[in-house]
A protein has these predicted regions:
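A short, Lys/Arg-rich alpha-helix, primarily the initiator
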Residues: 2-29, 73-76
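Short alpha-helical DNA-recognition segment
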Residues: 28-47
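Short, basic-rich loop-to-helix N-cap that marks the start of a DNA-contacting helix
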Residues: 52-65
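Long, compositionally biased
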Residues: 62-64, 70, 91
Length: 94
């Protein structure tokens, strides 16, 4: 009996990368300007964009309020990212 090797999930996309690529860059908005708008420090925003900081419930509410999205979108993006990272670490996909 042969065992099929599970496929690796694609490279996990961090919600910060999504923010940069789908919201800030298309709008031509700098990190400095967006940090001011959302009420975060530039350092906090930069850490989020670089994937060094995750989405918390409060951050999701901030993002939703400024971007006109839902907080659940940001929480779901973070949960999906975390699951993909865990699956890659274990070497399998569910």
């Amino acid at each position: 009996m042969t065992r099929k090797r599970a496929l690796q999930p694609p490279n996990p996309i961090h919600p910060g990368a999504m923010l940069l690529e789908e919201f800030l860059q298309p709008a031509g908005k700098s990190q400095v300007a967006f940090a001011r708008e959302i009420g975060w420090t530039r350092a906090r925003l930069n850490e989020f964009i670089k994937g060094k900081r995750g989405v918390t419930a409060d951050a999701a509410l901030d993002l939703a309020a400024v971007l006109g999205t839902s907080a659940r979108l940001w929480m779901n993006l973070q949960a999906t990212h975390d699951l993909d990272v865990a699956l890659r670490r274990r070497g399998s996909a569910a």
